[in-house]
Amino acid sequence: MYFWDKHKTITSYYELLSSRICDQYGLTQMEYDILMFLHNNPQHNTAAEIVKVRKSTKSHVSTSLKKLENKELVERKQSKDNKKHIEIFLLDKAEEIVEAGINAQKQFAQNVLKGLTEEEKYMCINVFDKICNNAEEYLREYKENINEK
């Protein structure tokens, strides 16, 4: 399928850029992705939200968070209001990695969007959002049908 094959090219390029950072700091791709996710989405700072938003497995997120804690890159804090609510925060030690990640993300965006007008960039974002929303809808329907059986 054309879209699927092309999407993998984009993902491969992003992973190439991020793999340099992973190698430099001794991180797995998942650990790096979690650090960048927490930086870019501070409102989604629980393990459950990382799983939900990133469509990752609970076990991979849990294992990666434990490793990030051991490397003193993140910290888990229990909510004062709700003992079951554990929030995850980036620590100062993660700042250098996140900065390198931001630079890689900027380079990625600059390179893959090269030659596009502002209007074309806007159109791409809108079309991609529609595609993702359609996929989300069908995933939701599929899960609902499975749960009904």
Region spans (language model):
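N-terminal helix-turn-helix DNA-binding core of bacterial DNA-binding proteins
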Residues: 16-60
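C-terminal regulatory/oligomerization modules of transcriptional regulators
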Residues: 119-149
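N-terminal leader segment of winged-helix/HTH proteins
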Residues: 1-25, 71-73
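Charged, amphipathic alpha-helical coiled-coil/dimerization segments
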Residues: 66-126
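Hydrophobic structural patches
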Residues: 7, 35-38, 128
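Hydrophobic recognition helices of helix-based DNA-binding modules
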Residues: 14, 18, 98-101, 105, ...
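Short glycine/proline-centered loop/turn elements that form peptide/ligand docking sites
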Residues: 25-28, 60-63, 67, 117, ...
